[in-house]
From Swiss-Prot:
One of its GO terms (biological process) is glycolytic process. Its EC number is 4.2.1.11. Pathway: Carbohydrate degradation; glycolysis; pyruvate from D-glyceraldehyde 3-phosphate: step 4/5. Pfam families: Enolase_C, Enolase_N. GO terms for cellular component: cell surface; extracellular region; phosphopyruvate hydratase complex. It is found in: Cytoplasm; Secreted; Cell surface. The lineage of its organism: Bacteria, Pseudomonadati, Rhodothermota, Rhodothermia, Rhodothermales. (2R)-2-phosphoglycerate binds at Q163, K339, R368, S369, K390. Its main location: cytoplasm. Binds a second Mg(2+) ion via substrate during catalysis. GO terms for molecular function: magnesium ion binding; phosphopyruvate hydratase activity. PROSITE patterns: ENOLASE. Gene3D superfamilies: Enolase-like C-terminal domain, Enolase-like, N-terminal domain. It comes from Salinibacter ruber (strain DSM 13855 / M31). This is Enolase.
Length: 429
């Protein structure tokens, strides 16, 4: 039966030195599943609740001993004796135990740790990789990496408003070739920045975080790096953006706090702004181009450019099927970012992906800015066949760990491995 014998949690540190939760699920046969939970910096208002201790004398209030205690007590008791092969039942039990819509009782960090650790124990029990356990025999699609090589916004201490400037090597023939392309462009960008006496210090997600003359200069630098690396922008490598617009809003106006704090922009202004960027640059995808509460603005944006570029809802949808369904009904966006800790269980995460695909939306598996060495999202991307992943730049071991896991999976799949190229972005075809 592979029943759960023991569930234990501990407090560990994430990539920012901030405490997070790690959970072990052990079966009666001694099989172990272990998962560590990430944490975001720019979090959506509608995400599941991450439980923190609030004790100013420990980790400046950011400790997670309360969440750890919930796992070691209530969660351990509730899951004892359950089969690790019954993921839906496990997650239903966790949700019922918490009893809230936003996981605010036990904490999404406690619940997700247990959920993912159980899934890993299930895979280990069957003697198969996690991607095979979750995706069955048909799982063979490697994701196009959206590599965050220039950081701004909440992810960097610089004067760049946009949070992420990414490259998508969608012209490569395989995942390993795509990763090589991304790494080469990343290292070339370092040289481009150095030539202009810009800093090559990196932000939370491994991308460079220099002070620049404008947001536009960030894109121009990336295009220069693509060319100098020997690739062609718009066919080999594309640009993707995450402005994180929710961080730019005050009193229903959009303000570029770092570069232009005295100018207020309306939703209509932002739609015009992004349409102009899409016309000017080889942009494949824009995430969180509008605020999480600006449903009308999202609809306007989707109507304006939604037939030519991927418009991704992160803070808008927060991996939540209810918010995603509203977005579908109101014509807001055409893609969803998938972050398991936004919703709190693996089953709910999988349901969000299924809902997206049912309605013709793309889905992108994503890390958080505060990461660990846990590689679950790499397996999740292959298991669900989303065809896209966001897991940072080609630096920082917490980011590269996911890429290395995808390389291993590609090797395991051998000739059956599929790299979707531009097919992962149907609007571009």
């Amino acid at each position: 039966m592979a029943s759960i014998q023991r569930v234990t949690a501990r407090q560990i540190l994430d990539s920012r030195g901030t405490p997070t939760v790690e959970v072990d699920v052990t079966t009666g046969e001694g099989v172990l599943g272990r998962a560590a939970v990430p944490s975001g910096a720019s979090t959506g208002a509608y995400e599941a609740v991450e439980l923190r201790d609030g004790d100013a004398d420990r980790y400046h209030g950011q400790g997670v001993l309360r969440a750890v205690g919930h796992v070691n007590d209530a969660v351990a008791d509730a899951l004892h004796g359950m089969s690790v092969l019954e993921q839906v039942a496990i997650d239903d039990t966790l949700r019922a135990l918490d009893g809230t819509e936003d996981k605010s009782n036990l904490g999404a960090n406690a619940i997700l740790g247990a959920s993912l650790a159980a899934a890993k124990a299930g895979a280990a029990t069957l003697g198969v990789p996690l991607y095979r356990h979750l995706g069955r025999a048909t799982a063979r699609t490697l994701p196009v990496p959206l590599m965050n090589i220039l950081n701004g916004g909440e992810h960097a201490d610089n004067n760049v408003d946009m949070q992420e400037f990414m490259i998508a090597p969608a012209g490569a023939d395989s995942f390993s070739e795509a990763l090589r392309t991304g790494a080469e462009v990343f290292h070339t960008l370092a040289s481009v920045l150095q030539d202009r006496d810009y800093s090559t210090a990196v932000g939370d997600e491994g991308g460079f975080a220099p002070d620049l003359g404008s947001n536009e200069e960030a894109v121009e630098l990336i295009l220069d790096a693509i060319e100098k690396a020997g690739y062609t922008a718009g066919s080999d490598v594309f640009v993707a953006l995450d402005p994180a617009a929710a961080e730019m809003v005050e009193d229903e106006a959009y303000v570029f706090w770092k570069s232009d704090p005295d100018t207020e922009r309306s939703s209509e202004d932002m739609v015009e702004y992004w349409a102009e960027w899409v016309d000017r640059y080889p942009i494949l995808s824009i995430e969180d181009a509008m605020d999480e509460d600006d449903w009308d603005g999202w609809a306007m944006l989707t109507d304006a450019i939604g037939d030519e570029v991927q418009l991704v809802g992160d803070d808008l949808f927060v991996t939540n099927t209810k918010r995603l369904t509203r977005g579908v009904e109101e014509g807001c966006g055409n893609s969803i970012l998938i972050k398991p800790n936004q919703i709190g269980t693996l089953t709910e995460t999988l349901n969000a992906i299924e809902t997206a695909h049912t309605h013709g939306f793309t889905a992108i598996i994503s890390h958080r800015s505060g990461e660990t060495e846990d590689t679950t999202i790499a397996d999740l991307a292959v298991a669900t066949g989303t065809g896209q992943i966001k897991t940072g730049s080609a630096s920082r071991s917490d980011r590269v760990a996911k890429y290395n896991q995808l390389l291993r999976i590609e090797e395991q799949l051998g000739a059956t491995a599929h790299y979707p190229r531009l097919d992962a972005f149907p609007l571009t075809n």
